[in-house]
Structures are given as structure tokens and as C-alpha cells.
A protein has these predicted regions:
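Extreme N-terminal basic, low-complexity initiation segments
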Residues: 1-9
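Short, positively charged patches
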Residues: 35, 39-179, 340
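Short terminal hydrophobic/aromatic SLiMs and anchors at protein ends
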Residues: 9-17, 21, 36-37
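Alpha-helical and His/Cys-centered functional microenvironments
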Residues: 6, 23-25, 29, 321
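Glycine-biased, small-residue-rich flexible motifs in mid-sequence functional cores and linkers
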Residues: 30, 40-42, 122-349
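Short, Lys/Arg-enriched N-terminal segments with co-localized hydrophobic residues
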Residues: 26-38
Length: 349
């Protein structure tokens, strides 16, 4: 049987079971086990958003804090001693103490609302299941727009310095994928990324832009893609794990963005990448996450195709038409899994 207690403002369950004439009591932090619905407690979200603005509080530290404290508000109000006891270290604990007086949780929440940005937690049923599988999954996702994040997705990435051939391929493949019911994911960078988003939009399909900055309009990067970002949010969505007012164009933020692009998708399609292109890093992430990597072959005389041709030599699947991708991912089976009920991963049980 289950009995709910509230002692000293710390709720917990006692699960009692007779075994060898003894009672075994299991103390459970309810925040760790419950799924949050779209009507999540506003207080919880406000404090989590505020914590996410503190330097050094990434997904790993956030999980440590949430496992130790009874609520996000308790974390926010904790003294140095208890923060250190949570296991996050004295340096980060001191940083939280120093930075939180300069952050107003309610004001930060109002900024989110003003920008029509909402938060998804990894315990939320809407949180993408594929992304939850990766070891570096964000604890918090910021989302602008509305769409099913568990729909089948393919990411398209490539060079900023594309050729006319690369542009033609990216647009055509994105358009055909969208027409086939696949959501096209990319990073809204110059070049292949932006062209892929445009192809999906022109097909009347769904596309997701994962950003390496926050979702407020003044920090959209590149700034020339502001109108594109509005179009994407209107029919698909923008995603980021960076809180409002995170400056645009910080180089270190792009690897964080890339792991979300790789984690969301069933597979990654690489269209034009130089020999040392950052796109290849994202392709390697996809392999680490057990995702398919597809590559479009290019001219052996083109610098922009050295990376993609090398990917193919290393085992990436050669793609010359959308049919190659659709056959590989078995779309009918994917659709069945997309509508399967959500389960709590074993790491969270």
C-alpha cells in the first residue's frame, strides 16, 4: 500500500511490504518519477528556467540537483552547504549563490511568454523519445511553434559554401522528404541548412530548426534568417536548449546544437561537406547515437564534396534519390513506433 506524508514540507511516499516479518520503507522523490503534462506547475518551470541561466548548470548538473532536492524552488533557495552536498562541487555551488540574486525567476518567465516560447522537460510526454535516448540529452528544451516532436525526422546538413549542385540537391531532397511525411531537421545556418528548410516549407511540410542560441528574435542567428525562422515557427518549430537572451554566434554553442540535431533524427543526410567540415562532426555524433548516416556523392574534383565522398568510403549509405532513404528507415514501421505510448527510460526508473 502507498501512504503519502508531508513532514517538514518534504513530501515522500512510504511503500511498505511484509517480508520476513519486517517492513521495508522506500523513500521516493515524487518529482523524479512523475511525467509533467503541458499544464506543468508554473512555479516548477520558473525556477528550472532560472537555474538554466546560471553558468555551468547543464543537463548533468540539473539532474544531480533534481535528484537531491525536493523541488526546483528548494534548489534555488538552498544554502552553500546543501548545494555542495548535492554533489555538484563547491565551485558551481558558489557560482549559483553568486549569480542567483541577479536573476528574477518571474521576470525570466515573462520574457519566455512574451516571445511565445515554452519549455519542455525530459519528463514531459511531448519530449522527443529519440532525443531522450542519447547520453547528453537536454534536461530542458525551449520550443517556439507547435508540432509533434515524435514524428519521423531526417536531418539535412551540409556546407555553408555550397555549389549550385549542392543547392539543387538539398532543396529537392528536403521537398520530397516533406512530401513523404518526414519532418526535415536542420540548423538554420547559411547554405545547405537554410535551403533544406526552404524546400520543406515550399512543400507545405514540417521542418524543425535547432538553434545554437536562444529563441528570442533579437538573438536569431544568422540575423538575415529572421523571416525564415518566423516561417518555420509558423508551420513547424524552433528548438534550443539555451535560455532566453543567450547571445548569438558563440562558437561553443554549435556542438551543443549539433547533438540535438543528431539525436532528434532517425538519420542524417549530408549534402556537400569539405574534408574538415564541422558537418562531419555532426555525422560522427549520429553514428555514436546509432543513427543512420546518408551521404550524397559529389564530384571528385570538388573541394565541397571531399568530406561526403570520404563518408561514403567509410561506410555511410550512398543516396542518389529519396527512395534510398525511405527504404532504409522503413517508414511504415517508424509511424507505428511514433504513436507508441511513452515509457520512462531505465536510467530514470
Amino acid at each position: 500500500f502507498h501512504i503519502f506524508y508531508l513532514i517538514d514540507y518534504y513530501p515522500y511516499y512510504i511503500v511498505s511490504t511484509p517480508h520476513n516479518q519486517k517492513l521495508f520503507h522506500i523513500f521516493v522523490n515524487p518529482y523524479k518519477y512523475c511525467y509533467h503534462s503541458r499544464m506543468q506547475n508554473k512555479n516548477i518551470l520558473q525556477y528550472l528556467n532560472a537555474l538554466n541561466k546560471i553558468d555551468g548548470v547543464g543537463p548533468k548538473r540539473m539532474r544531480q540537483l533534481m535528484a537531491f532536492f525536493i523541488s526546483p524552488q528548494a534548489i534555488w533557495e538552498a544554502d552553500l552547504e546543501n548545494l555542495v552536498l548535492s554533489g555538484i562541487g563547491e565551485s558551481l555551488s558558489q557560482k549559483i549563490i553568486e549569480q542567483r540574486p541577479h536573476i528574477d525567476p518571474e521576470e525570466e518567465w515573462r520574457k519566455l511568454e512574451k516571445e511565445n516560447v515554452r519549455m519542455l522537460l525530459e519528463t514531459d510526454e511531448e519530449y522527443p523519445r529519440l532525443l531522450k535516448e542519447i547520453p547528453t540529452a537536454p534536461y530542458i528544451l525551449y520550443m517556439k511553434g507547435e508540432m509533434d516532436l515524435n514524428a519521423p525526422m531526417i536531418s539535412i546538413v551540409g556546407s555553408r559554401h555550397h555549389t549550385p549542385y549542392g543547392s539543387q540537391v538539398a532543396y529537392a531532397f528536403a521537398k520530397e522528404l516533406a512530401q513523404s511525411g518526414i519532418t526535415v531537421v536542420s540548423g538554420m545556418a547559411f547554405g545547405i541548412d537554410s535551403i533544406a528548410h526552404r524546400g520543406a516549407l515550399d512543400a507545405g511540410g514540417k521542418t524543425i530548426a535547432v538553434l545554437g542560441d536562444s529563441l528570442d528574435e533579437k538573438n536569431i542567428y544568422p540575423a538575415s534568417n529572421l523571416n525564415l525562422s518566423r516561417e518555420i515557427a509558423g508551420s513547424g518549430c524552433l528548438l534550443s536548449d539555451f535560455p532566453i537572451e543567450t547571445p548569438a554566434g558563440i562558437p561553443g554553442n554549435f556542438p551543443a546544437r549539433n547533438r540535438i540535431i543528431a539525436g532528434l533524427s532517425l538519420g542524417k543526410l549530408v549534402i556537400e561537406a569539405g574534408e574538415k567540415s564541422g558537418t562531419l562532426i555532426t555525422a560522427n555524433l549520429a553514428l555514436e547515437f546509432n543513427r543512420d548516416v546518408f551521404a550524397v556523392p559529389g564530384s571528385i574534383f570538388s573541394q565541397q564534396s571531399l568530406g561526403t565522398n570520404n563518408l561514403i568510403k567509410s561506410g555511410a549509405k550512398t543516396v542518389t534519390s529519396i527512395k534510398d532513404i525511405l527504404e532504409e528507415i522503413n517508414l511504415e514501421e517508424v509511424h507505428k513506433k511514433s504513436f507508441a505510448p511513452a515509457k520512462i527510460p531505465s536510467s530514470q526508473e
